[in-house]
C-alpha cells in the first residue's frame, strides 16, 4: 500500500485523489493520509510565514515514515532542491492561467475604478496594478469556497485565483474571465503537481514515475530555474510560463521547442520587465537561467530592490 500524504483542504485532497486513482488504475494499491500544515492552520499572510509553509510538514511525514510519498502544488515547493527527497513525478499540468471571478459576470476591464479585487499574491497584485485600471487590491486568504463567497456576499467586487484550482473543484462556471499571459503571467509551476518521495526509495520512485509527463516537467523546470535565479536576494513578484510548441525548420520538418516567458514587476505596479526565450526540453534549466539573465540585463535587479520592493537578505 502506497501511503500518499496530502494537505487537508478540499483542493489538496482532490488533487491528491487524482494521483491515488491513477496509481490504482496502474495496479498499485494506494491511500491518502491527511497531514496538517502551518499554512493551513494560520490566517497570516503567506509571505510572513516563511518558505515551505505548505510543504514542510508533508516532507517531515515522508522522512519519519508516516507516509511514503506526498502530493504538493508544485508552486508551493521551495526552489532549492532538498537532497533528502526526489520529485519522482510531475503529472500532466492543468491550465496554468489565472482566472477572474467577478460580480455580475464582469471582466476586469468592465469593473469601475475603485472596485475591490481580492488576492494575497504579490505577483497578481503587482500585475493587476500595472494594468492601470484603478482597482483597489485587498488581501485574500482561506480556502477556495471562502474566497468565492467574498464575491457572492458583496464583500469584494472580484477575486483573482488560479484557474486550475477552480477546475479541480468543478467551479469553472464561476469564472468570468481567464487572463491570458500577456495580461498576467502565472506563478512558476502554477497548475502543476509534484509527487515527492524519499531520495533513496528507488522502487517507489519507479512506480510514481509512471505518472510523469515529460512536457510538463520541462516547462516547470524552466519556470522554476528562472524563479530560483531571480530569488537570489529578492522578494519581488515574478511570473513565468513555459510551453512545448511545434516549430518548422527551413526544410519543412516539424520539431518541438520549449518557449519561456518571464516577468518581474514592481509591487506598486509602476513597472513590469518582460523577457522570453526559446530552447529545448532537454536544456530546460538552461533556458530558465538565460531568460532570468535577460531580465537582470533589462533592470530586474534594480526594479526588485527599488522602492516598494526589498531584498530577502544578503
From Swiss-Prot:
Pfam families assigned: Porphobil_deam, Porphobil_deamC
Q: Which cofactor does it need?
A: dipyrromethane
Q: Which PROSITE patterns match?
A: PORPHOBILINOGEN_DEAM
Reactions catalysed, semicolon-separated, are:
4 porphobilinogen + H2O = hydroxymethylbilane + 4 NH4(+)
Q: Name one GO cellular component term.
A: cytoplasm
Q: What is its EC number?
A: 2.5.1.61
Q: Where on the chain is S-(dipyrrolylmethanemethyl)cysteine found, per UniProt?
A: 234
What further fact does the record state?
Answer: The porphobilinogen subunits are added to the dipyrromethane group.
Record's family? Answer: Belongs to the HMBS family.
Q: What does this protein do?
A: Tetrapolymerization of the monopyrrole PBG into the hydroxymethylbilane pre-uroporphyrinogen in several discrete steps.
What is the name listed in the Swiss-Prot or TrEMBL entry for this protein?
Porphobilinogen deaminase
Amino acid at each position: 500500500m502506497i501511503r500518499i500524504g496530502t494537505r487537508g483542504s478540499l483542493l489538496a485532497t482532490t488533487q491528491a485523489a487524482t494521483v491515488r486513482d491513477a496509481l490504482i488504475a496502474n495496479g498499485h494499491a494506494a491511500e491518502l493520509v491527511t497531514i496538517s500544515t502551518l499554512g493551513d492552520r494560520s490566517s497570516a499572510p503567506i509571505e510572513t510565514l516563511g518558505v515551505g509553509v505548505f510543504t514542510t510538514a508533508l516532507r517531515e511525514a515522508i522522512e519519519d515514515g508516516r507516509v511514503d510519498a506526498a502530493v504538493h502544488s508544485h508552486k508551493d515547493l521551495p526552489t532549492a532542491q532538498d537532497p533528502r527527497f526526489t520529485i519522482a513525478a510531475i503529472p500532466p499540468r492543468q491550465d496554468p492561467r489565472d482566472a477572474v471571478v467577478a460580480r455580475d459576470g464582469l471582466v476586469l476591464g468592465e469593473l469601475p475604478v475603485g472596485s475591490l479585487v481580492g488576492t494575497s499574491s504579490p505577483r497578481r497584485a503587482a500585475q493587476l496594478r500595472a494594468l492601470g485600471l484603478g482597482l483597489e487590491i485587498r488581501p485574500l486568504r482561506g480556502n477556495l469556497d471562502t474566497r468565492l463567497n467574498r464575491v457572492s456576499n458583496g464583500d469584494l467586487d472580484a477575486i483573482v485565483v488560479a484557474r486550475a484550482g477552480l477546475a479541480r473543484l468543478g467551479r469553472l462556471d464561476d469564472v468570468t474571465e481567464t487572463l491570458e499571459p500577456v495580461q498576467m503571467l502565472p506563478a512558476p509551476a502554477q497548475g502543476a503537481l509534484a509527487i515527492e518521495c524519499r531520495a533513496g526509495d528507488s522502487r517507489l520512485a519507479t512506480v510514481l514515475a509512471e505518472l510523469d509527463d515529460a512536457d510538463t516537467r520541462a516547462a516547470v523546470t524552466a519556470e522554476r530555474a528562472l524563479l530560483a535565479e531571480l530569488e537570489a536576494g529578492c522578494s519581488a513578484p515574478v511570473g513565468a510560463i513555459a510551453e512545448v510548441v511545434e516549430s518548422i525548420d527551413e526544410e519543412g520538418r516539424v520539431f518541438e521547442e520549449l518557449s519561456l516567458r518571464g516577468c518581474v514587476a514592481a509591487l506598486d505596479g509602476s513597472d513590469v520587465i518582460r523577457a522570453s526565450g526559446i530552447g529545448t526540453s532537454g536544456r530546460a534549466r538552461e533556458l530558465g537561467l538565460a531568460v532570468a539573465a535577460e531580465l537582470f540585463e533589462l533592470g530586474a535587479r534594480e526594479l526588485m530592490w527599488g522602492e516598494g520592493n526589498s531584498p530577502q537578505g544578503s
